[in-house]
Amino acid sequence: MSIIDNRKATHDYFIEDRYEAGMVLEGWEVKAIRDGRVQLKESYVIVRDGEIYLLGMHVSPLPTASTHIRPDATRTRKLLLKAEEIRKLIGKVEQRGYTLVPLNLHYKNGRIKLDFALGRGKKLYDKRDTAREKDWQREKERVLKHDTRVNQRDS
C-alpha cells in the first residue's frame, strides 16, 4: 500500500532501474508517516562514505510528539540495502548524468520502505517530447472510444 508518491520524478527523470530499501526512522517519524504527514517532492538520495542516505524528505511531527526530543523534520535518513546492492549503485551513480531519485513510500510487512530509482535527468526538450507523446496517446484513445460508440449505435 503506497503512502506517498513522488510524481515529479517521472516528469524530471528517465527511470532506468528501481530499488527498494528500508529506512532508519525514529518513533515520532513512523507515527507521522502513518498519519500521512510526509513529503517527498524536494528529496533526493546520495551516496556518502559507502552508504546511501535520503536527504530532504520532510516529515511534519505530530503535535503529540515526544517532549524530551526535538523533532528535525528534514534530517538525513540512512537507507538500508545489502552491501552488494550498494556497491552496484555506487558504480552506476559515478557515471556521468546518473542520480538516485526517490519514487514512493509504502508499507511492506508492516515496515515503511522507500522505492527509489536510478535515473538520468531530462532536458527541457525531452519533457516536451514526453508531454507531446502523452497528449497523442490520450487523443488516440478518445478518438477510438468515440468511433466504437458511433459504430455500435449504427448497427
From Swiss-Prot:
Biological-process GO terms, alphabetical: trans-translation
Annotated compartments: Cytoplasm
PROSITE patterns, A to Z: SSRP (PS01317)
UniProt keyword list: Cytoplasm, RNA-binding
Top-level taxon: Bacteria
SUPFAM superfamilies, per database record: Small protein B (SmpB) (SSF74982)
Record has Nucleotidyltransferase as a keyword: no
Pfam families listed in its UniProt record: SmpB
GO cellular component, one term: cytosol
GO terms, molecular function: RNA binding
PANTHER family linked to this entry: SSRA-BINDING PROTEIN, TMRNA-BINDING COMPONENT OF TRANS-TRANSLATION TAGGING COMPLEX
Reported function: Required for rescue of stalled ribosomes mediated by trans-translation. Binds to transfer-messenger RNA (tmRNA), required for stable association of tmRNA with ribosomes. tmRNA and SmpB together mimic tRNA shape, replacing the anticodon stem-loop with SmpB. tmRNA is encoded by the ssrA gene; the 2 termini fold to resemble tRNA(Ala) and it encodes a 'tag peptide', a short internal open reading frame. During trans-translation Ala-aminoacylated tmRNA acts like a tRNA, entering the A-site of stalled ribosomes, displacing the stalled mRNA.
Stated family: Belongs to the SmpB family.
Protein name (Swiss-Prot/TrEMBL): SsrA-binding protein
Source organism of the structure: Bordetella pertussis (strain Tohama I / ATCC BAA-589 / NCTC 13251)
